[in-house]
């Protein structure tokens, strides 16, 4: 049956060539590529296409579990969707093959560690931001809204929808500025 490959990197700066070569060597006839974050299933149209169109007996091939998902929950959602369709998941660089009991167990353990790694990275980032704030060198991102501009437009009689559209913000933000939430 068909083997469908999926290659993913986090940014466009990273190269997919090694993953694509490994997937070709694994016998993948079709390879979908994506350069998106693996932190969520949202915003990954190539992955969703595979999950929507894979058939019973086909194998979804990745190089490593972390190329597919960064949380156990997302990993389980993917595996459940594949299982419901009668398809399997195989990782070329790890002994994860959902068609075997041992492969399923190993796969779940890798998912736990991928989630753990993501949580550690978030903790380190939060610690770094806190330390930078203490030293006065981290200010956060600049505010997206121009409170004065919103108030001026409101005084001129413009409606919240037009203001939001023109300034690229949500209507709710306009209402909050009008109420005085953003002082």
Curated annotation (Swiss-Prot):
Domain Resolvase/invertase-type recombinase catalytic: start-end pairs: 2-136
InterPro entries: Homeodomain-like_sf, Recombinase_CS, Resolv_N, Resolvase-like_N_sf, Resolvase_HTH_dom, SSR_resolvase
Site residues by UniProt (Ancestral active site Ser): 10
GO MF annotations in UniProt: DNA binding; DNA strand exchange activity
One annotated GO biological process: transposition
Alphabetic keyword roster: DNA integration, DNA invertase, DNA recombination, DNA-binding, Plasmid, Transposable element, Transposition
PANTHER family the record matches: DNA-INVERTASE FROM LAMBDOID PROPHAGE (PTHR30461), RESOLVASE HOMOLOG YNEB (PTHR30461:SF26)
Family designation: Belongs to the site-specific recombinase resolvase family.
Protein name: Integrase-like protein y4lS
Organism this protein belongs to: Sinorhizobium fredii (strain NBRC 101917 / NGR234)
Classification lineage: Bacteria, Pseudomonadati, Pseudomonadota, Alphaproteobacteria, Hyphomicrobiales
């Amino acid at each position: 049956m068909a083997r469908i490959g999926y290659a993913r990197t986090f940014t466009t700066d990273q190269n997919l060539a090694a993953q694509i070569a490994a997937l070709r060597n694994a016998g993948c006839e079709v390879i979908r590529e994506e350069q998106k974050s693996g932190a969520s299933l949202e915003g990954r149209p190539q992955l969703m296409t595979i999950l929507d169109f894979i058939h019973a007996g086909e194998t979804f091939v990745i190089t490593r579990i972390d190329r597919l998902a960064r949380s156990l929950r997302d990993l389980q959602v993917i595996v459940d969707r594949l299982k419901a369709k009668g398809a399997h998941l195989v990782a070329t660089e790890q002994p994860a093959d959902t068609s075997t009991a041992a492969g399923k167990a190993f796969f779940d353990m890798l998912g736990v560690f991928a989630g753990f790694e993501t949580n550690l990275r978030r903790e380190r980032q939060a610690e770094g931001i806190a330390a930078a704030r203490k030293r006065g060198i981290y200010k956060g991102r600049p505010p997206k809204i121009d409170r004065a501009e919103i108030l001026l437009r409101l005084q001129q009689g413009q409606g919240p929808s037009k203001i939001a559209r023109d300034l690229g913000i949500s209507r709710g933000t306009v209402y909050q500025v009008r109420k005085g939430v953003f002082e």
